[in-house]
Regions:
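Conserved N-terminal glycine-rich FAD pyrophosphate-binding loop of Rossmann-like flavoproteins
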Residues: 39-76, 186-199
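Predominantly flavin-linked oxidoreductase catalytic cores and closely associated redox partners
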Residues: 41-46, 127-277
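Dinucleotide-binding Rossmann-like beta1-alpha1 core, especially the glycine-rich loop
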Residues: 53-143, 148-155, 166-172
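Hydrophobic structural packing positions in well-ordered secondary structure
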Residues: 25-28, 53, 152, 273
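Generic secondary-structure signature for well-ordered alpha-helical cores
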Residues: 33, 97-108, 244-248, 274
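Extreme N-terminal leader/targeting segments of oxidoreductases
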Residues: 1-12, 30, 43, 58-60, ...
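N-terminal Rossmann-like FAD-binding beta1-loop-alpha1 element of flavoenzymes
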Residues: 10-37
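Alpha-helical scaffold segments in soluble metabolic enzymes
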Residues: 27, 91-94, 98-101, 165, ...
Length: 278
């Protein structure tokens, strides 16, 4: 074609390469539909790793819902042209099932309560209501619900994540949180980036060193929250190994973007998109 533009023919073109676009492309390809994906996947790096269904409706009132399916019923009644209103609840549930099955197969298992939203602490000490969370975050859901004695850990020079700020902001809802700032094993950086930390924890010696430092300040804590940097490629293995070394449940706290959670999702989708020939 003129100008060297290559013509491509397909049954379906998906425009947009965020989580929705990537999921749609995979759903289609897995059903034998010849699919092309148009877009840059950079936006997925801004993902927290949390998967929402519906927790606030109407937005202008800021009404929150424990039951996302009841919220969907209200949304369909109030906004009949909304995309959610055009899909049966069973199809939405099946889409979530398919997405979570795919992520589990990619080594990124998720947890949820099928008929309830959950609350999870996130960066800066906010609490987010969501539907599905990574397995590495789930212990934080339980710790917040039970108001467990908990230690929040941050690292020298890691920007955008302060254990003290998180504990201070959560104090009215979760009193008695303790904090610790630790040096990160595996190298000295003038400024630490989340991806560097996640890669460093691929090495067993770094996990052993970090676990030793955490145990030294554990005290009476029954759980430990850390920034979501516990591995990039072997997330579940690294998380379980570090948790075993520390001796109490750990949980990741989603960090500000660009995030390791976004990198994990991007890599998982890229692997599967390549396999599916999208």
């Amino acid at each position: 074609m003129p100008g060297g533009v290559k013509e491509m023919r397909c049954d379906l073109a998906v425009i947009g390469a965020g989580i929705a676009g990537l999921s749609a492309a995979l759903f289609a390809a897995n059903r034998g539909i010849e699919t092309a994906l148009v877009g840059e996947t950079g936006e997925i790096l801004f993902a927290s790793g949390l998967m929402d269904l519906l927790s606030v409706h109407p937005l202008e009132e800021g009404k929150t819902w424990d039951d996302p399916w009841a919220a969907l019923t209200a949304l369909r009644r109030d906004i009949p042209d909304h995309p959610y209103a055009r899909m049966p609840a069973a199809d939405i549930a099946a889409a979530f099932d398919a997405l979570l099955a795919f992520l589990k197969n990619q080594g990124l298992p998720y947890r949820r309560r099928p008929d309830r939203n959950v609350e999870v602490p996130v960066a800066m000490g906010a609490v987010k209501r969501t539907y599905c969370v990574p397995e590495t975050v789930w212990n934080g859901v339980r710790a917040l619900e039970e108001k467990q004695p908990c230690l929040i850990v941050d690292f020298d020079q890691l920007r955008g994540f302060s254990a003290r700020q998180i504990a201070s902001t959560l104090e009215p809802r979760w009193p008695g949180l303790r904090t610790a700032r630790l040096p990160f094993p595996g190298g000295t950086f003038s400024q630490q980036y989340a991806e560097q930390l996640a890669m460093a924890l691929e090495a067993p010696r770094n996990r052993a060193s970090l676990a030793c430092d955490i145990r030294a300040c554990l005290g009476a804590a029954r759980s430990v929250g850390l920034p979501a940097v516990l591995g990039l490629y072997r997330v579940q293995m690294i998380f379980e190994d570090l948790q075993k070394r520390v001796g109490v449940p750990l949980f990741e706290i989603p960090i500000l973007p660009p995030s390791v959670a976004g990198l994990r999702l991007r890599d998982a989708f890229h692997r599967e998109i390549g396999r599916a020939h999208v």
